[in-house]
Amino acid sequence: HPTFANRVICNYELLQEEITLDRLRRHVLENMQLREKSGAKILITFIKKQTAYDFFHRMKEALGEQSEWQLKLLTGDDSIYERESILKPIRENVWKKVILISTQIVEAGVDIDMDIGYKDISKLDSEEMFLGRIARSGIKNGIPGIVYFFNFDQADKIYRDDYRMEKSLTLGNEEMRTVLKEKRFQTYYEQVMHYLKEMKNRETSEDGLEYFFSES
């Protein structure tokens, strides 16, 4: 649909460096400064809950008590009531300046529309779901949404048994960035199946493998 075409820009500059939470904080603060007059809704998502907590406290320290920005934390520990007390004002535009730090809980079933996103990379499926939380209503005032991807918690070590964490199938691979931009997920799933087939090939004889796929 033309309304949603190019509504979100994916930025990979933070993947070019070994990111630290202090470096990430500086980057977020710079974006906040650029949006000081107009305001912005910023979503920052981590894989690990502890990292989300750590970054929340770093941002709280940086903002101080007098900041006009609302700083909120959302994890799986929150009750439905606590979660809604954060999400409702965001949905209803009560807060013009808000930073929401979260775990991947925001990827599924959370109805919010943010302007700027930061995400620790994991599976490509997760990246696509995250993009769905940014600029959902399309380009605002001529400004598209933007998502900065970074690599902090090394998702391949967390999801060790998930073949989708093979580097060639993540945003560590330039081709997957194109897949994400152009929404060519058929290419992604074909490569996932190819990789799975290779893995099966190591575990079974060639005849057994061909039988496995011919029967599936």
Where are these regions (language model features)?
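Conserved two-lobed SF2 helicase motor
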Residues: 92-107
